[in-house]
Amino acid sequence: MQLFPLLFSLLLTSTPGSWARNVRRQSDTWGTWGEWSPCSRTCGGGISFRERPCYSQRRDGGTSCVGPARSHRTCHTESCPDGVRDFRAEQCAEFDGTDFQGRRYRWLPYYAAPNKCELNCIPKGQNFYYKHKDAVVDGTPCEPGQRDICVDGVCRVVGCDHKLDSIKQEDKCLQCGGDGSSCYPVTGTFDGNDLSRGYNQIFIIPAGATSIRIEEAAASRNFLAVKSIRGEYYLNGHWTIEAAQALPVASTVLQYERGVEGDLAPERLQARGPTSEPLVIELLSQESNPGVHYEYYLPANDPGRGFSWSHGSWGDCSAECGGGHQSRLVFCTIDNEAYPDHMCQHQPRPTHRRSCNTQPCPKTKRWKVGPWTPCSVSCGGGVQSRSVYCISSDGTGGQEAAEETQCAGLVGKPPTTQACNLQHCAVWSVEPWGECSVTCGTGIRKRSVTCRGDEGSPVHAAACLLKDQPTLTEPCVQEACPVFRGQAWHVGSWSLCSKSCGSGIRRRQVVCTIGPPGRCVDLQSSKPAEMEACNRQPCHLPQEVPSIQDPRTRSSDPRMLSGPRVSPVSDGREQQWAPLERPRAQSNPREGQDPNLSSAGRAPTLQRPPHQPPLRPSSGPRDCRHSPHGCCPDGHTPSLGPQWQGCPLAGASCLQSRYGCCPDGVSAAEGPQQAGCTRSHGSDNTGNRPGSRAVASKNPKIHQPQAHEGEPSECRSSRFGCCYDNVASAAGPLGEGCVGQPSYAYPVRCLLPSAQGSCGDWAARWYFVASVGRCNRFWYGGCHGNANNFASEQECMNTCRGQHGPRRPEAGAAGHRAHVDGGQRGPGGQQEPDWHRAGATIPRLPSPSGSPWRREQEPAPGEPPHIPAYGNRPGGQEIRPRVPGLDREARPAVPPTHSPSYRIRLAGSEPSLVQAAPGQAVQLFCPGNIPSEFQAGWQKEGRPISSNRYQLQADGSLIISRLRPEDAGIYSCGSHRPGHEPQEIQLRVTGGDMAVFPEGQPRHFPEPRNPDLGHGPPHRGTGAEAGGHRVLSPSHPRPATRLRLDRTQPGVVDASPGQRIRLTCRAEGFPVPTIEWQRDGQLVSSPRHQVQPDGSLVISRVDVEDGGYYSCVAFNGQDRDQRWVQLRVLRELTITGLPPAVTVAEGDTARLLCVVAGESVNIRWSRNGLPIQADGHRVHQSPDGTLLIHNLRPRDEGSYTCSAFRGSQAVSRSTEVKVALPAPAAQSRDLGKDCIDQPELANCALILQAQLCGNEYYSSFCCASCSRFQPNAQPVWQQG
């Protein structure tokens, strides 16, 4: 019994302690609130928070404080400035350019995710979204256009008073805490069902509407569309359905909601408002309309707004960061219709442009690669490399190099090397040799050589190495041919008679062709005579045959007319051909003049080739090729029968004669010191004349004239001539087998050197010299050669230059390459006239009397011919064409003259000078021999040229249009040429007394060809010429030039009634021509027809009666020229033949006619505002404007518009195309055994319900169901 009181007392003593501990546990208290944190946003409503500590006595680490430890409040609730980026979009943009599964995207906000406060973003152009963060930054709106915001990952309510968790809300009129009395509702249901397929207008929401809500009554295949009253679609326009999204429209945010593809759900549109412009709501109808409910609110007691400004939504920002701009349309409206802007001019006009996205751009790192180098080999497997480096981009286009370590974290550094040209190399394949070309003697045999690829198929010869190409031909030796008696002796032509009268002697060559003379004696007893008497008539009678004293003849033998004149010097200098001279007693006053220099007004005379008479008619055969049996293998002896009968055997030549060969390599000398050989031209101190026969002399060098320097290339006489290097022989007429093709922009055939061919039928032809852009003459042997061969200069220029070929640097232009020491060589190595190669013209010299032109003065007897000045070297040294037969030391010094001539300024240490006047155009050529690919680096005063008035031409020259004084300075070019200094040209812009003739438009007004001045452009000035300008000094008389009209101007001009038109007419010549315009032979003169100072005719207010032909007539007192211009007055455009509506059965062809009255009209078709592209299969558009659509389908229905355009005129007409569906069959057709449903793979009922039979993937599982039910095709979808 005593135990219970003890226990009771212990309980009483322990209870107060336990109670005290419980009291202390519950007395955990909050400390004071801390400071408010910075606001999470700078505008638009951010969140700031503060925290307080809990003081607790608990030992387990927990607390017993009741209430939140953090308090939030809104801050910076004022609206953000215009153009600031969406806050959620800024957070998504932080991941732009970062690696995401091996790719880099631009991220946009995605609002349709279930959790509104997660940072879900969607890549631009993709159809998936990704959660980048679990929570957005505090203060981010939960949905666009709404006031609720996210705080700590939870969507919190914000009242209209901008306070967190406030219950104060806006009414439908957007009044905070209002009762809705300041506006009135507009509600209704659009349930019309007689709608056409396509877009149908439902209603118009006026400007100023608030609390807009539009929703389908039930799910359907129809779509809601929104556009402005100007016809600009904001949503689902042009048959393109967009995904659910928030759209900035009419200064509010329009929230568009619909199900994804295959998920039928009613469509819904919501917007807070107020709208800044009327919005047109349409229904894109595809099936019956279940009804569309709509509700919006308008301000109450609106007295009628009258005319007022409306504006559209702001467009996209021009830059994603770093500061851009955006614009919007501002227009005047009343009663939901647009009116001209001046109707609203009494009200302030809203701004239409603002800045946007001013935040700095983030820097991103990425790898950048350079171009691949050429492959190390052309076949068989090689390697090529490229540079790969790390760069940093700032988002505005700026880039800078970065350390590779900064890109080390990026996935997949691009490779720096790769294999290339892995295909097997092509090889030469040879066929067996063919038969020999002869049955006896020596001939040739051929075989076929083909380049074949790795599979044995033939490929182009360029794929094989040309140096390894097997030979195509080789000699073959058959049995010796029988020798006939008449073929043993080779008899040459008679030489000139030793006397012209009184019995002279002449000789000829008689050679045994089969070996020693004894063999010929065995076959033929009598040897033909080698010498006979000649000219035995008395001296008062004419000579019977040509003699040394008078080589003229009436003989038709072409070999009697001229002969080679060879200098017997031992250094192998070239032969020179010239006309035979008359005896001094019969010489004309021009005797002694250089035969290669032309008289004024004539082109330079060609020098004759070897073995060739002057180019004049002759009745006799020209060479052995005209003999009945052709030529012998030596190329000059006529064959006496087939199989080279009577031809000399190999080795039986003049080399076996007693005194050896003459310098021509064919004729045998008749005595020592080349006695009996024909001399080269040029006179000597013994009185022998050119063309005379030589006699033995103790001083053989007496008759040696100066020959031209330079060795003739052996390739020139090959079958196809020389390659571009003038050393190697070409393998074909287009330079096959040649390397190092020049980089001139001319056809390939025009880049080759001249080729004389392998025959001797000499004729003058023309070839193109690409280095100067002109044509030159050369001797052609009559067969083979290459394709750079033309019958006339006009054909040559038209083929190689055409009307718009690369511009030829004019003579005198800086940088023109002067070929001074030698021109193109003719047959036998003779020089062709240098002035043709350089593109210059030998000018006429002015007479002392001051007349503009006269023929050149005759040189005094014994004096060398006078040579006009050809050009100046820097420092005054003059450059002239070489005079054949005249030694360099014997050249006379030509005194300076004021004659108008072309001069060539060679590149030197001083800059070339170009002068021009303001307003003109000037073309600068790079001085020196610089290829065009190195001329592109033009600079002025050491800085790159960037003005749009500077245009770089294809030939590397620079054109400066509309010259200004500030364009003067030092221009340099060729700076990209490795190892060379840039060339400089000084441009001086002056308005002094120098008359400048610009060549600013060379392609539109080509240089003339004056037949009186050779083949160069007309002389228009004197003095130094450079840079494409020709400067005429007023201190010297200007020469007369031929009148010509610019015929490159349009010959047909179209105009519309009421227009002002100009008919151009440009003329050049001196004296300056006057221009007049005529029509029907009468002068054109009226207040509407005015002739301008530049010669053009201006017609004001063109009328239909002004159409017709006009002639421009130019006259300068000496010449007269005219050209015709047709003026066509175009009538108004009209369209006929297109009915308002067309109904075509399904599967048939729709033929839509569009007949347009008018000329030069372009016709375009469109469907529902989108252009129609003809595919050549189902859709065709003929030139007359007819549109054909085969196999018409229901989806082809719509509004088709034919638009006709001509200049600024346009007209259009539309028609509605309806498709008549066939009547349903009474019984279902047999679908066949293969067309069945596959229920184990797809739910066909759902596919039919979702109307996905038009999808190839889904319909493949439900063939039978989709065949029985073919829904109409749906519009194009765009997801994301």
From Swiss-Prot:
It is found in: Secreted. GO terms for biological process: extracellular matrix organization. Residues 1-20 form the signal peptide. CDD domains: Kunitz_papilin (cd22635). Residues 585-599 have a biased composition (Polar residues). Residues 900-990, 1039-1128, 1133-1218 form the Ig-like C2-type domain. The keyword Secreted applies. InterPro entries: ADAMTS/ADAMTS-like (IPR013273), ADAMTS_ADAMTS-like (IPR050439), ADAMTS_CR_3 (IPR045371), ADAMTS_spacer1 (IPR010294), Ig-like_dom (IPR007110), Ig-like_dom_sf (IPR036179), Ig-like_fold (IPR013783), Ig_I-set (IPR013098). One of its GO terms (cellular component) is collagen-containing extracellular matrix. Residues 750-800 form the BPTI/Kunitz inhibitor domain. Residues 706-715, 879-891, 1002-1012 have a biased composition (Basic and acidic residues). Residues 541-626, 672-715, 800-902, 1002-1042 are annotated as: Disordered. Keywords: Disulfide bond, Immunoglobulin domain, Protease inhibitor, Repeat, Secreted, Serine protease inhibitor, Signal. Disulfide bonds join C39-C75, C43-C80, C54-C65, C425-C464, C436-C476, C440-C481, C750-C800, C759-C783, C775-C796, C926-C973, C1065-C1112, C1154-C1202. SMART domains: IG, IGc2, IGv, KU, TSP1. Its main location: secreted. Belongs to the papilin family. This is Papilin.
